[in-house]
Amino acid sequence: MRSPARDATRLGRLATWVVAVIVALIAVSRVTGLVVDWMWFASVGYAGVFRTIFLTQALLFLAVFAVSAGALWLSGWLAHRSASQAQAWRPEVLGQPVGEIAARVPWRAAIAGVAVLVGLLMAVGELSSWAIALRYFHQVPFGKTDPIFAKDIGFYFFTLPAYLALRNWLLLLLGCSAVLAGVVYGLRGDIALVRSPRGLSPAAATHGSALLGLFFALQAWSYWLDRFMLLYGDNGVVVGASYTDVHVGLPVLWLQVGLAAAAAAASWANMRWRDYRVPAAAALLVVGSAIVLGTIWPALFQRFYVKPNELQLETPYLQHNIALTREAYGLTQIEVKPFPVEQNLNLAALQANRPTIDNIRLWDLQPLRDTYAQLQEIRTYYKFLATDIDRYQLGAGYQQVMLSARELEPALIPANAQTWVNLHLLFTHGNGVVMSPVTEKSAEGLPSLYLHDIPPLSDGGPVIQEPRLYFGEGGKGYVIVKGSVPEFDYPKGKDNVYTAYRGRDGIGIGGIARRTLFAWHLGDPNILLSGYITQESRILLHRNIRNRVRTIAPFLSLDHDPYVVVSDGRLYWIQDAYTTSRWFPYSQPGTGGGANYIRNAVKVVIDAYNGTVDFYTSDPADPIVQVYQRIFPGMFRPLGAMSQDLQRHIRYPEDLFLIQARIYRAYHMEAAEVFYNREDLWEFPRQLTGMSTGNTPAARMMPYYMILRLPDEPRAEFVLMLPMVPSQRENMIAWLAARSDPPNYGKLVAYTFPKEKLVYGPFQIEARIQQNTEISQQISLWNQMGSRVIRGHLQVVPIENSILYVSPLYLRAESGQLPELKRVIAAYGDRVVMEDTLGAALAALFKESAPAAIPAQGAANARAREALAHYDRAVERLKAGDWSGFGAELDALRPLLEALGAGAADERK
């Protein structure tokens, strides 16, 4: 017969072994993860970044663990040492079964174990504070101060977050110490809450008073820190310290600092008095003041004094919010210029602005991606994940183009072919890009292709010498290169072409130890068991470019749209990265994450073949990136170190521009009274897109790239622009442009229209398009014939001092997936036309500006007929898209018109 004691012993040993095995597995997984991370960071040239982050986390972990465990152990040990020994372990005091448990507890070991366990948990919880610690120790000044406390903005970015993190940890540590001491005293019988006599033993009262004093001292410091948090409050009209905060909240916080400090002193004095009324009175005083003075009194003051005089009292604080919000988002750099809207556009002006006309985008992102997919994906496992917009200097001149990388998606490989070898050794990379001009189309309504097929062929586009993409917007899994299995490169007829990776990326996994390491880390035993892995084999990790950049630089925020670039015969990805913060005083939060400061401080370039990642500082004046340069020396290079060709492709990022435009809707108003009354609030225009079914929902217009010549500028350039309309109105009031070409990269310009002139907004143009009988009848006819009409995005095109509107129209078979560009709608002034091509639409739009023959005799009459003939031929050339012929006819027309004008003047004399 087995003894229950022996069974209990065996069960205890089994439980110990199970726990030990679990802990060992967790430890092994953690260690292997660290080793793999170290190897990967070293392979991409950023071992220093890994070392800095790891050592900071290790030091932070050890410091927090040592202090936390030490403080917890000290609190528990003092409680154990001071507890009333006479009452210890007596079930009649504690009751059953608590008394029996207390009698068996190995107190010293238990207290040490709890201290170590809780200390470990607290240390793990503080690991994420490594960036706060590094920024604190490497901070730089902003050179600007806040208007209330006159502290440098850098204090709020780098010091205040560290103080708040320290406060939160200390409060948690103090709370855990109090709980541990309370449990010890309770189990030892020093706290009687049920049995008589109720109360605390002298030792428990002394210990509790000491801890309560520490709490009040921390609370005093917390109130001191809360003064600075007033700069982020939203109790007034806008974010930031309001009149009530400054004149009521701030004095109250100083009073609460004093009350909490007095309560701390009283609590420590009570260690001698041991009178529960002292800490009770102190707690009541602190809590009561927080409720009455910190909550009720400011609310009453705001309601009955500030609210009736809000504009007068809040004006200085409104000005603080306006000025600092504009500073935080870079809006102070916006140059405001008038746009007179003369609306005197004609064919000659179009010819003078050919770079703009030649680059009006007729292809929307989604229809073009659908067309690329049908024409150029070649095989089911290729995928165009995104369509990008850029500009290139090509044979036809400075052109805006759209392009998409042909990436390999393993999930699209047929299910019966998704073997481990195929997924990780055979299908390793995508191939090439497709590129097309934004304005051109074929006779069938399909895009003209500058780059197409596999391997990529160039028809007027740049030449690609290395088209393979091992790194891209897909690339979710790992691949192994240089194995005994040749890598699939591209299909050729009925056969396939194979290749071998010759790039620099990858971690060697030829040895058995490394194969075991990666098999464990990735949870894939095939890495260890496969016979296709050789001594030269290498594993490529983090092939998704956003994941790759985020792994190296987790402290940067990334733009949603990395874009592919063809440069010097190779493929690169450019990823815009931001430094952000939520600690800019008085600044209005403008992102979903609550950030109220943003700079596009870094441009990241990733080689699509080699996987190399280079960080370039595009805003070296940003204090946050200066701090990171001090933390990670050598990581960031100046933008001038980027190759000249790649520099031609940097562009103003969409996410940043969108955030700035949203803030600028209200914060273009710099006068406090105008801002308070929202007299000139702007909004993004509405427009119609998608299927034309008669009830197409309206959506807000988003920023778009285009090539145009800004007013008073000598040449066309690549800009990101967005029109603006007044709030709850549809007429256009301004347009905002961000310049992308050197040397004006990053400059923002707001062009404002005269308020006395009506300028049609996009939604008003959309309404006029829908009201046009010919256009609506044609769309209805197409829809009835089994086709689906897709309305493209309307583009506002500023030319000279006029506004032109252009919108593409696509047709797609009801059961098909191939959109075709069938019509172009153009509007100018009061006219709306729809034609087969952009040239034909412009010719029809400006047909009324044909020169009228002056009724004269002889040579003048002949010149008039000749001028009209040249004009008619110019219109025909424009319809055909023959811009050189169009220009030649206009050049021939000019002297005839001048002669006619001179003759008419002579007759008037």
Curated annotation (Swiss-Prot):
The keyword Nucleotide-binding does not apply. This is UPF0182 protein H16_A1615. GO terms for cellular component: extracellular region; plasma membrane. It comes from Cupriavidus necator (strain ATCC 17699 / DSM 428 / KCTC 22496 / NCIMB 10442 / H16 / Stanier 337) (Ralstonia eutropha). It holds the Pfam family UPF0182. Keywords: Cell membrane, Membrane, Transmembrane, Transmembrane helix. Belongs to the UPF0182 family. InterPro entries: UPF0182.
